[in-house]
Amino acid sequence: MASRVKPSVVYWLGENLYLNITNRCPNNCYFCLRNFRNGVGGFNLKLEKEPSVAEVVMELGNVINKKNWREIVFCGFGEPLERLDCVLEVAEWIRRHYGKIVTLRVDTNGQGFLLNRERDVVRELKMAGVDKVSVSLNAHDKETYNQVCRPSFKNAFENVLEFIEKAKGLLDVEVTVVRIPEIDIQAAWEIAKRLGVKFRVRDYIQPFW
């Protein structure tokens, strides 16, 4: 069971390598996998402490050459942009040592500007070598977002839309929603279409109880 193994900073699924750098998140989504599982693919993603940049780089260095990875993704049991500087430093390390042979992606709830006030988050990601962001929209309006994602920030939904709008000019942007009853998938798709970004629906992974 995942709960019996050491917490993983680096894990892999299919052709992608993932970096689990924090368990902090400003949202408390009722459907989040971490509410009823300790990890995925046999990896335990419940961190005992946040890894330093040096620790992330060390773990990454142990596995990065084991396969021709399609993407390296900042994604775990938390919001990566809670640790923007860690994301930037690790991305820069990857580009410095491995060039552009692998795509770098950040999976985010899109609240990077709220988490990092007074910073040009999107441009900093671009300058560090990040290619793509996958933004979890998970709603078709503010009321639904507040209901299912339960954000700690006021006006989180509006800020997610702002993040998408600013990111699309510099990065490859995909918007995702989870297939749950509260979300109007068509209306969410219309938002993505209006913003001019790609759209993907993710299946809801049910708890086992």
Language-model regions, residue ranges each:
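Conserved strand-to-helix beginnings and helix N-cap segments that scaffold or border functional pockets
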Residues: L84-L88, E118-R119, I185-W189
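Flexible, charged surface loops at secondary-structure boundaries
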Residues: Y11-L13, I64-N68
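Alpha-helical elements of the RecA-like P-loop NTPase motor core of helicases
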Residues: Y30, E143, Q186
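Core AdoMet radical
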Residues: R37-P51, N68-R83, Y98-V121, L125-N159, ...
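Auxiliary Fe-S-binding modules of radical SAM enzymes
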Residues: A2-K6, S52, V57-M58, N65, ...
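Surface-exposed amphipathic alpha-helices with a cationic face
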Residues: L88-G99, K126, I164-G169, W189, ...
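Canonical Radical SAM [4Fe-4S] cluster-binding loop centered on the CxxxCxxC motif
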Residues: R4-E55
